[in-house]
Amino acid sequence: MNNSEQLIALKESETAFLKYFNKADYELVDFSLVEKLDWKQLNHEDLQQMGERNFWQHEHQIYALRNDFTDQLLRYYSMYPTAATKVAYTGLIIRNNEAAVQVGLENYAPSLANVQQSLKLFIQFIQQQLRDNVHFVVLGHYQLLDALLDKSLQTPDILSMIEERNLSGLVTYLSTEHPIVQILKENTQQQLNVLEHYIPNDHPALVELKIWERWLHTQGYKDIHLDITAQPPRSYYTGLFIQCHFAENESRVLTGGYYKGSIEGFGLGLTL
């Protein structure tokens, strides 16, 4: 496929996404690539993200190029509430001076049923329009770390070793028998079963992970992995997250996660 054909295919995929979810009764939204920001309203995490963002000042006003749709929509709807419970978007995001096209969905005040329905529809779009399918799924939950590791041990060094799956370092700091070390020693396909030995069966994170595992099995997905190493990109990501890796285009990953800040929601996004 030459450059012109790739460009046409990309634009057609964006349009097809909007048509598909418009037909499914999602509200289509179109936000400017340029965000107007107020320094006084930016929190510590907003300021930390400025390192990857392109921003400038004009007449005492700060402007920045969008780097995350969920964050932009959350910021906007916090100021201007919407009655919409499910929205669909497409457009550019700019991170570290690199541009990419993203398509995605946001479910506000989400229920398990409507989030799973959104994921099901998204995968159907991938199958029908992108001619691809989900090869394997990664599940995780941002409450797991607190369940497995005492707050006093959640130092930058230890968190970094967990993220890097540095078992030798973790053994030194935590011990061989520590739950995190024991879980990480297992194949990721087995870790969800092993997790049951280290946290109560009624722990909300484990209950939710098991519900999703069962639902994914009913959808025909058996290759399911647990990730206990991921740490939330923003503090409002407090619950379950999911990554659906593609069979044909291995660079593509459909990602999603639950968040609760000024607005509660569950987002699903895919970079084309």
From Swiss-Prot:
InterPro entries referenced in this protein's UniProt entry, alphabetically: aa-tRNA-synth_II/BPL/LPL (IPR045864), HisRS-like_core (IPR041715), HisZ (IPR004517)
Entry keyword set: Amino-acid biosynthesis, Cytoplasm, Histidine biosynthesis
GO MF annotations in UniProt: catalytic activity, acting on a protein; transferase activity
GO cellular-component term (any): cytoplasm
Pathway(s) it belongs to: Amino-acid biosynthesis; L-histidine biosynthesis; L-histidine from 5-phospho-alpha-D-ribose 1-diphosphate: step 1/9
Biological process terms in GO annotation: L-histidine biosynthetic process
Stored SUPFAM superfamilies: Class II aaRS and biotin synthetases
Major location (coarse): cytoplasm
Subcellular location, record wording: Cytoplasm
Domain of life per record: Bacteria
Further remark: This function is generally fulfilled by the C-terminal part of HisG, which is missing in some bacteria such as this one.
Function statement: Required for the first step of histidine biosynthesis. May allow the feedback regulation of ATP phosphoribosyltransferase activity by histidine.
Self-association state and partner proteins as the record states: Heteromultimer composed of HisG and HisZ subunits.
HAMAP family per the UniProt record, alphabetical: HisZ
NCBIfam families: PRK12294.1
The family this protein is said to belong to: Belongs to the class-II aminoacyl-tRNA synthetase family. HisZ subfamily.
Protein name per UniProt: ATP phosphoribosyltransferase regulatory subunit
Organism of origin: Staphylococcus aureus (strain MRSA252)
